[in-house]
Amino acid sequence: FLYGLGASVGSLALTSLLRAEEAGLKPHKGHHSAPAKRCIFLMMEGGPSHIDTFDPKPELTRRHLQAFNRGGEQESAMSSGKRYFVQSPFEFIKAGQSGADICTEWVHLKEMVDDMCFYRGAQVESVNHPTACYHVNTGNRFGGDPAVGSWVTYGLGSQNQNLPGFVVLPRTSYPQGGAANWSNGYLPAHFQGTPLRPQGSPILDLNPPEGVTRNRQRANLDLLAKLNGKHLATREGRTDLEARMASYELAYRMQMEVPGILDFD
């Protein structure tokens, strides 16, 4: 990742560009005071079902083991064959002063429900995993729109200009649908997510190649920045080129910052 990036401020024009790019990631002040400074979004593909955790379905219990028929709707390969309603195997209780519904298996979490907000209005229009993942992460089952992390970064900015404002932490592998789940969509390219590797070094090439000193790397990146600046001068409005140039400088700063941030020993 970092080896393919790399550069800095090689000219006055590029300096101005990078300042503009960084301004998009700096903390923003909205119309109202925002108590949230960061967002952790858990996309648990294959995680516990909502009907087994926080969303009891009494009607599902009443119809337990009755045959399921879509009646009148077009059948698909995934809906063919016999299907049955199946109730949750867990019991639910009303917890906290709010009386929130929660599964009895959440022994400790039930003590915190008054500090939680439950949203039960989400629906998805696809039975396929990739399109369903796109819908959850971007709001569009066909992908192509900005991911939720891109919108949060766009709205809040980042408090640390030496690190990406939006990082992705895949557990063992990418979710179905791949990198489109953290795409910037039609937002400027620097709002896209930066994945960290789940195994080994979270980010590759945190150190320059053997035999390349920091000073030499700096000189190489400055030259690359100068050449990229000339290339961009004839292609105004190309946010992908602008973001790539800004990412070179970010990558260089990350080489200094990331080792300490990601050292959990």
Predicted regions and their residues:
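Ligand-binding pockets and gating/stacking loops
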Residues: 1-265
